[in-house]
Amino acid sequence: MTLELFNQEFEGIVGQLKSYLLRITASIADAEDIVQDTYIKAQEKLSTFREESSLKTWLFTIASNLAKDNLRVQKRWVENVTDITKAAALSNKKFFEEAMHIRTTSPQGQFEIKEHIAFCFTCISKSLPLEQQLCIFLKEVYEFKVSEITTILNTTEAMVKYYLHTGRTKMINVFEGRCALINKEGVCHQCSELNGIFNPKQKAQEEVMKIEMAQEAEKGDKEHLFDLRMAILREIDPFKSKASELQLHHLEHNRQLMDNYLEKTSI
Amino acid sequence: MATTVKTTFSRETSVSADIKADAAIVWALLTKASDYPRWNSTVTSLEGNIALGETIKLKSILDAKRTFKLKVKEFEPEKKLVWGDGQGNRVYTITKNGNGAVKFSMVEKIGGLMFPMYAKMIPPFDQSFDQFASDLKKESETIMNSK
């Protein structure tokens, strides 16, 4: 592959690569750094690229290997991350002032429940063991085949299936217990609550019912509801969406809090 | 079906199952402690790191109030896992049969000179062994057949 063709194809893949890295680092700066390092490494090794896999698979392999060395990728959060960060945000006037400023001034400062669903998944998925988190994103969001994930993560098909199954099952159970969009008894209403703050003229329940996952909730098919949640993530580019600036601000807030929380609770 | 062989000073229960799944999947399920209660209906909690020399804490449906502290004595990836205490050992073995399936077996022998004194206080293992093997087979094959 020539450098010119590589650069051209890289442009088409870089958006997905960057969003993948953001979702596993929860850090804008780290995601951007790893994208740059991936480009440099890929360019250096271009002569070794035999096109046995697609360029997208090859780039995700390089990026995943670089990401595994990143401390923020290695750090595992806790399942109730959104409870911890909500409590902190409520006592942080500056956070809401900044968020409201973004909401009123930025073209990418809209609040949409769907975008918050994607953001929420990013945060909670960091409580999974790393391999499970990576497999879920690669398969369900970036639509790699199991055989391609074996290349990206340098593991066997059996283990990819194991990570996918255990990760999916864990996340299904977490959301079933927490998410009020799919379970009336769910303890977390943050997306509707934030919609009330950022879009006070909207009726939150009406907004919720525009989302297919919420419409399908009563049928109780947990696997299907998880697939619908993944479909929401696939639709959203966290760097380019209408709510990206607001959600990135929120993500930075959560990451900093979790960095401190994990430091305090580590033995 | 599980079988038990009793002698004056020991009791040995064993069960085996043919599992149509990769040995790596069976091994991963057997060695991820915190995941046990999700797929294994005989284990209510399992804490610790299943690795050679580590101590784990097991709670089982056989005696919900008791926590068994067990040491991991052998750890041969995708082949053999042994944990136990002073009263006995549980041995798990996985044998690849060449066509992508494995034979899983689980044996627990308890005993010693004092065994006759407490033998009657230990409930039979047969049913929970059958359940364990059946749960492992079901979960392994579900994972193997996933797309």
Residue ranges and their predicted role:
Chain A
Residues 4, 8, 79-130, 147-154, ...:
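Intrinsic, short, N-terminal disordered tails of RNA polymerase sigma-factor systems
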Residues 39-43, 53-82, 164, 168:
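Σ70-family region 2.3-2.4 aromatic/basic alpha-helix that recognizes the −10 promoter
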Residues 1-19, 32:
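A short, charge-rich alpha-helical start-of-domain segment used by transcription regulators
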Residues 47-51:
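Short alpha-helix-to-loop micro-motif enriched in aromatics/charged/Gly
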Residues 135-136:
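A short pre-motif secondary-structure segment
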Residues 17, 21, 31-42, 62, ...:
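Short, small-hydrophobic-rich alpha-helical interface motif
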Residues 14, 131-132:
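The N-cap/first-turn positions of alpha helices
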Residues 22, 139-141:
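Short amphipathic helical patch at the helix-1/turn junction of helix-turn-helix
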